[in-house]
Structure formats: C-alpha cells, structure tokens
Amino acid sequence: MFSKLRSLIFKLDPEMAHSLAIKALKINSFPKKNVVKSNLIKTTIFGKVLNNPIGIAAGFDKNAEVYNPLFKLGFGFVEVGTVTPKSQYGNEKPRVFRLEEDKALINRLGFNNSGAEKIYSRIASNKPNGLLGINIGPNKNSENRLEDYIICVRKFYNIADYLTINISSPNTENLRDYHNHKQLNKLLESINNEKSNLNSKTPIAVKVSPDIDDENIEKISENLIKHNVELIIVSNTTDSNRQNLININKLEKGGLSGKPLEN
C-alpha cells in the first residue's frame, strides 16, 4: 500500500505533493486512539511533558495551518514557519527538487509565508494542543533584518511555546552572515532586550547551519551561552556535500536535505 502511494506521490511535482499533504491534513480526522503512548519515550522540554521527542520541523507547516492535526497524528511537538513580518512569495518556481537515488531533496523556497499578522491570527483563534514553536526570519528585501526579528518576537512571544531564530537558511541571501560573532552577538542582545521590555520568559532557540567550521562552532557556542539561549537546533539544510551525489538535480541551487546531510 505504502509503496504504491509513494510511487503516485513521486509522480507529482514535489511542491504540489506538499500542498496536497497540507490539504489532506486540513480535511481529515485522525483518531487519537491510534497513537501509541509509552512512558519510556516521554520527554520534558521547557517544563512541558511531551508524549515523545519526535516532532515536525519548520518548513512543513509554514503557515500554521495544520499543527493540531499533526499533534493528533502523534507528533510530540510542531514548529511552524519560517514566518516573516510581511507576507512573501519566496523564490520563483520550480524551487523544490527530488534526488531519489540520493534519498535527498533540494529546495530554494525562500521563506514563502503568509506573514506575521495572518499567522498570528490563525494561531490565536486555534489553540495548539501541544508544544508549538514558531520559527522567525527576515523578509527577503528588508532594509533592516535585525528589526524584522524583533517585530516577530514582539508579535509571537505570547502565543509561542518557544521562538526559533532562523539564521541559517541558504535561500535568503547573506542570512548566514549572522553566524559572524559580532552580528550574532548584536542580534541576540537585541532580542533579549526586547524580551525584557515585554517581560517575556518565552524560550529562544537558534537554528544554525551544518556548514560551520570548528573554529566558528566554538565562537557561536560562546555567544549562545552568553545570551542564555535555551535551545540549539542542528541543523538547517546544507549547500555542501554534493560531490558524491548521483541525481542531476544536485546542480540546482538551494539547500540540500536528507541522507547526504549525515556526511
């Protein structure tokens, strides 16, 4: 059954297949009784007990449309986004490419999302039934990226169980400059100042690139500790590790995910 369904899905454009998955989750009901629970895999994070440590990363439910159906399927947590202050289309299509032989995917979506206002309203009107993280980032053409992060912190701090600061997507030009010691220090200092102004205790996570050298790993770690960042998300997609890939789509620009990321 699964192999036949997989074969059918893989005949579709990958972004269309993703859209169909979102639509299917919106209209179907999945009974909770089918979800296996065990005390052996219960996990506590940010003071909340999760039934299991398996969650959905940002990038699947970009616009916070199906987080509750995902909880109903049994996921321990869901992270929505990446959300930017203003809605944006992202990069031009096609922008998602399968590499079947390599068990991988390349995407250059570019933070396509409905924008902070609409996504906030959606979450506020549909209470999450589990741990919900909100992944935030700057608009593509923003003149002040640091301020974009602050706008999103201000918008979502009171409805997110945690906020993820995305500094690592390879599909937003120069975003990874925030891995630089001085820039990251300024960003985290500004976010903590804003949290203080808001009297917010919302935990902060930082999502980093897998392409960091050892020297910068140490510097970034020092920064995260200095600013009391509660969680590190490792990792985003890579723009390296392509030399041994087979599929011709390896030449496409974008972030690589899947099995090659293990190397």
Residue ranges and their predicted role:
Residues 2-43, 107-112:
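An N-cap/entry alpha-helix motif that binds or orients negatively charged groups
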Residues 22-36, 170-183, 217, 223-263:
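Glycine/Thr-rich beta-alpha phosphate-binding loop at enzyme active sites
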Residues 33-56, 118-128, 199:
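N-terminal amphipathic alpha-helix/helix-capping segment at the start of soluble metabolic enzymes
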Residues 50, 66-88:
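Active-site cofactor/substrate anionic-group-binding motifs, chiefly glycine-
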Residues 54-58, 76-80, 107, 132-136, ...:
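Hydrophobic faces of well-ordered beta-strands that scaffold small-molecule active sites
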Residues 81-131:
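A gly/proline- and charged-residue-enriched helix-loop-helix capping module
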Residues 86-95, 116-118, 125, 171-200, ...:
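Active-site-adjacent beta->alpha loops and helix N-cap segments on the catalytic face
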Residues 138-150, 205-225:
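Active-site glycine- and acidic-residue-rich loops that bind
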